[in-house]
């Protein structure tokens, strides 16, 4: 059965630790089972802390994103395709590290 989730931007458009905590707490308090984040830069977000909080609250996590023009994997330019693949590799690793399965 599908879980009802909510995008983090419903609660906050930021990615500070306080904003993320508020997002997780509100999502959990209101009975959502999944929280979706736009791509989070692992150099700016404490991924271990976030993964731990997601587990503690019993939430699932998804990450959404789009690729920039210089990362278009359908491009005829191999360097642009390679950049897109690298971006996606980092995104998949982030989802994995957060304990999620949805990108």
Q: Predicted regions span which residues?
A:
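N-terminal pre-domain/capping segments
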Residues: 1-100
